[in-house]
Amino acid sequence: MFKQDQLHRFLFKNYSVRGELVLASETYQHILENHDYPQPVQQLLGELLVATSLLTATLKFDGDITVQIQGDGPVKLAVINGNHQQQMRGVARIDGLVAENSSLKQMVGTGYMVITITPTHGERYQGVVALEGETLADCLDDYFRQSEQLPTRLFIRTGIQDGRVAAGGMLLQILPTAEQGSAEAFDHLVQLTATIKGEELFSLEVKEILHRLYHEEDVILYEPQAVEFRCTCSRQRCADTLVTLSDEDVNHILQKDGNIDMACEYCGTHYIFDADDLAAIRIEKKNRLH
């Protein structure tokens, strides 16, 4: 039986270090279920999902984070978007053959990772780092080193649990109020956390996991937050996109297909617009202009 998708925040009482633990297997399953991705791409999306959930939980404001991988290999794009409510969605775009057991480099080729932080109120921030690490976690380490943010380490695990895909992970971060000497404590905790196995994350209760990892430490565990798949697509958003098309383009599609079928690449939902729908959209467009 799958454990509920949740994010757990915790704090080391004797160190200026905070932590997070997330399990997102059901959300991972939802992201994959409308697509037929090769196994290495499935794994990449699972890793991105865990990373995005953990990073989103570090936000001190309402907003969202998008973590995306782009490159010139067969996997042109892999992206996960999540918000402060831990609502996640994601997709990959593939153009070419992805061989079994492909590495990140073999899938993406020469590329980069973009992390975009978008507050509900405020300016957007975007960080870019070249994909030079062997794994996504390595690339995230590079990102934190280059962006001069608080020392942060992520530990990402994906796999199969009870015949279904599973994804989880942990994050450690030094607090802004950290005193001198915290770096040594942080490194010690990183070494302990690195021993976590996927099977432990997927099957054990959070308190047991923390006890196994940090049985000599005093850990404060906070109330969990639910993690879920949630797509933000809607018929209105599709209509807003159609408004940007010229009448000539719309008429051409109608003559050819009889309607316009718009499919969300995140969740697979189809939105059908016939001639009457499009006429109403045109009227709305004219009203907006006046």
UniProtKB/Swiss-Prot annotation:
A Pfam family hit: HSP33
Which ranges does the record mark as transmembrane?
none
What molecular functions are annotated in GO for this chain?
protein folding chaperone; unfolded protein binding
InterPro entries xref list: Heat_shock_Hsp33, Heat_shock_Hsp33_C, Heat_shock_Hsp33_N, Hsp33_helix_hairpin_bin_dom_sf
Q: What does the record list as GO biological process?
A: protein refolding
Mind naming one GO cellular-component term on file for this protein?
cytoplasm
This protein's record includes keyword Cytoplasm: yes
- Keywords for this entry? Chaperone, Cytoplasm, Disulfide bond, Redox-active center, Zinc
Q: Which family does it belong to?
A: Belongs to the HSP33 family.
Q: What HAMAP family does UniProt report for this protein, alphabetically? A: HslO
Record-given protein name: 33 kDa chaperonin
Organism, by scientific name, is: Photorhabdus laumondii subsp. laumondii (strain DSM 15139 / CIP 105565 / TT01)
> What's the gene?
hslO
